[in-house]
Structures are given as structure tokens and as C-alpha cells.
Amino acid sequence: MQSSGQKIIMHLDIDAFYATVSELLHPEYKNFPIAVGSLNSRTGIISSPNYLARSYGVKSAMPIFLAKELCPNLIILPCEHDIYQTYSNHFFQIVNKYCNKVEITSIDECFIDATNSIKKYHNNVRLLAAKIQNEVKNKLNLSISVGISFNKTIAKMATELNKPFGISIIDENKITNLIHELDISKIPFIGEIKSQELYAINIFKIKELIASNNKQKASLVLGSMYQNLVNDLKGLNEIKTIEDDIYKSISHSKTFNEDLNDFYEISNELNELISNVVNRLKKHNLMTNNISINIKYPNFQTKVKQKRLDYYTDDYQTIFLAIKNLFKKVYKDELVRLIGVSLNKLVPKESVKKQLFLFD
């Protein structure tokens, strides 16, 4: 896949991130099945197993007692979130050296729009991917997998085809053979619940999901996301750049070293998240009129609450109070594994000023 006027979107994902970093911190467990887990939670859940543990059937979100049944010699290591964050920061610093259009989607993965950067690498996207892989490996001792395509959905799916430390490229000619035969559970973003609902109406493979005769019943399950998803899977959507996506939302989240259920402790962590997203909002000269908060529990279930503001703003106090009020409504004294905030429906500050000027 080489640059020929078409977008080049790369998805970069650090392989078994938490487990690999913990393995680096504990070299005595090299070549042992290990997993990062929350031993102090009520449930005891696996957060991230290394690849050796996965070969025994150990998976993320699996109860620790069940993981131990599958792999009796499994070593459970505590979460070291501050250290993970340090490694993550170094990873994104490396990525930004190669491309300035980067969309960070979590602590260990991102998308880059390499459409314009690829010229520096002889229009060879595989060469660019390998250079990033090798620098991350040499400097951080982490392996990353790279998926490359012309939209984010297909690029993310490509990453999963050749893990760990793989490079997968999917162009229009390969979609039918590599993507359409896959199970619908392989589609990013739809989740296990939606997958089960699609199974219940006899839609099992991607080719069945995108078939025109299944449109009506699939739309009932997937709602407004159906058409965009199908267009992505068919390769029909005009690709928006990473710069375009910056104007959709700004978000930040934190996974706790131990599950928390103290309101004030969680609230203090929330304060830092709010400060982070508002500072980024101001840095990009943007404003928002929609905020959301998401909470992930030890069993990996997630609760999301959203609120529309009466007007566009970048005012810290306004956003702070809105998010804190939202948190008070959604939090019910449960143990919390992760908390995140998001500013949505973003617009350039200048455009809001122009609209106000029209009514002066």
C-alpha cells in the first residue's frame, strides 16, 4: 500500500502492554506466565495477561480464580499505573517524531494519519511502520503491532491479524478476503452485548452484517452507528483526517492501581482529569457544549453519563461544576477501576465569536 492520493491510516498498539511492562520490572519472572490483576478488589479480575499466560486460555477481564484453574502456576503482579504512564508517554514521544497527525485513543494505542508523512519514507508505508516498531523496541523494549488501511475501523482490525510485533496492510483489494469472512465480534467498538444481539438474529459474520437483506434488522440492533460502520467495512466512507477528529472530542482517563470506593478520593482524581482536558481545550482554541463521564468497574462493565450544556464554553469553572454534578449523579458508592471525562461537540473558539458578533 503506497501513497496514491488515498488516505493512509495506521493503528499502533503496544502488545500486552501492562503485562510486558510489569515483566520488565520483574525480570525474575521472564518466561513465566504472568498477569496484571487487581488482587485487592472484591472480584479479583485479570487486567492484562502476557502471551504465555494467554496460551493457557487466560484472558483480560477473567476472574483470577478461573485464570488460576486454567494456569495453576500463573503469577499475578500488581498494577503499576504511574510506571505504565511513563512508558506510554515515551511511546507517544517516539510516534510524534514520525508524524504530527496523531490521535491517542488509550494508554497503549493510537492512530496516525501518515498520508503526507509517507513521502519521507519513499512512499513505503511498511518501511515507516518498521522504523517505528524498531525504535520502540530498541528504546523501550516493547513490541508494537501495526495495522494499516484507509480508515480507522479497518486499520484497527488489521492490527489484530498479525500480533504480536506484526505489520498488516489491508487495501480495497483485500477487504473481501481478510475482513468480510471474520466474525462480527472482531469489529472494533460494537462490544460483546451488541455482538450477542446480532448473533440472536442470525448475523454471525461481517459479510452477513453488510448484506443489504439484513439492513433492517441489523439497524435495529446498532442504531445510528449502523450505516457508518457498514460504509467503513465496505471501504466506502470518505476518510476524515486525524486533524478532523481532534475537533470531535478531548478525553482523559485514569486506571487506578487499586479499585477505589472512597467518594472524595475518586473526586480528587477527577479534578486532575478535568484540569487536563480543559487545558487541552484551551490549547487548541476550542469550545464545548457537551460533557461526559465514564466509570469502569472491576468486572469491566462501564457506565457513561452525558450532559449537553446551554452554550459553548471553555471556562474552567463552568466545565468543572458540570462534570462534578454529573459524577454525583452517576456514582453510587461502588468500587471503581477507571474514571474518565470527555469534552464533546467541539468547535473552534473563533467560530463561536463570529456567531455572537452576528447578534450584536
Swiss-Prot record:
It comes from the Bacteria. Coiled coil: none annotated. Poorly processive, error-prone DNA polymerase involved in untargeted mutagenesis. Copies undamaged DNA at stalled replication forks, which arise in vivo from mismatched or misaligned primer ends. These misaligned primers can be extended by PolIV. Exhibits no 3'-5' exonuclease (proofreading) activity. May be involved in translesional synthesis, in conjunction with the beta clamp from PolIII. Mg(2+) binds at D13, D108. It catalyses: DNA(n) + a 2'-deoxyribonucleoside 5'-triphosphate = DNA(n+1) + diphosphate. Monomer. Residues 9-191 form the UmuC domain. Binds 2 magnesium ions per subunit. GO terms for molecular function: damaged DNA binding; DNA-directed DNA polymerase activity; magnesium ion binding. Its cofactor is Mg(2+). The active site is at E109. Belongs to the DNA polymerase type-Y family. Its main location: cytoplasm. This is DNA polymerase IV. InterPro entries: DNA/RNA_pol_sf (IPR043502), DNA_pol_Y-fam_lit_finger_sf (IPR036775), DNA_pol_Y-fam_little_finger (IPR017961), DNA_polymerase-Y (IPR050116), DNApol_IV (IPR022880), Rev_trsase/Diguanyl_cyclase (IPR043128), UmuC (IPR001126).
